[in-house]
UniProtKB/Swiss-Prot annotation:
Protein name: Fructoselysine 6-kinase
Quaternary data: Monomer.
Keyword line: ATP-binding, Kinase, Nucleotide-binding, Transferase
Presence of the UniProt keyword Kinase in the record: yes
Function statement: Catalyzes the ATP-dependent phosphorylation of fructoselysine to fructoselysine 6-phosphate. Functions in a fructoselysine degradation pathway that allows E.coli to grow on fructoselysine or psicoselysine. To a much lesser extenst, is also able to phosphorylate psicoselysine.
First and last residue of the signal peptide: none
Pathway terms, separated by semicolons: Carbohydrate metabolism; fructoselysine degradation; D-glucose 6-phosphate and lysine from fructoselysine: step 1/2
Coiled coil: none
Amino acid sequence: MKTLATIGDNCVDIYPQLNKAFSGGNAVNVAVYCTRYGIKPGCITWVGDDDYGTKLKQDLASMGVDISHVHTKHGVTAQTQVELHDNDRVFGDYTEGVMADFALSEEDYAWLAQYDIVHAAIWGHAEDAFPQLHAAGKLTAFDVSDKWDSPLWQTLVPHLDFAFASAPQEDEALRLKMKAIVARGAGVVIVTLGENGSIAWDGVQFWRQAPEQVTVIDTMGAGDSFIAGFLCGWSAGMTLPQAMAQGTACAAQTIQYHGAW
């Protein structure tokens, strides 16, 4: 099985209604969810020298993630206020903290040499690393979320093996966008559709995966779970539809409890 590292964003999700705080963020979540499949992932991110930063590092270590490159910087750890409305999450105030200045060092790049797959997301200030990582032979994955107007769709996709995004539902406009993304150089584009499952375009055909029917407690981390399950499946030699099915199963597991993990 291939090795995987994530780079970029972390965030402590604070639920005032529950009087609880959960470690999260795309790079953090994807790394943690990969441990469900026997992978010991690495993560490069920045946390503040505050209690939330300490909590996040402890939480990651306890889940089996290599935190040797979770760097502590002077300042505040990124945090988001989250409210639950009918078991769906609604994001409130966001404080980016030390992550606002995140960048990879030369030592970080050297450390990434041991990993086969590198994943990041649009919030992580990591996109500038991907041309170099892709040129070095890494299998690259990036989540642009629902930011369909982002300039990254023009500049980043030639350096991606897997481009992830989200949308409410499948329609002709979405299919045309997906075809254009692969035409610009991405290997595969995969779009999660919430309760409508997911769809992928590999340059030859569309692949669709229905959601699993489970009792939804909290949708936090669903998309990140899908990405982790998918990438772990692909790294183990699964076909595209098999990896999508594993991503769906991973997401179904996550949405049945509060918090990302």
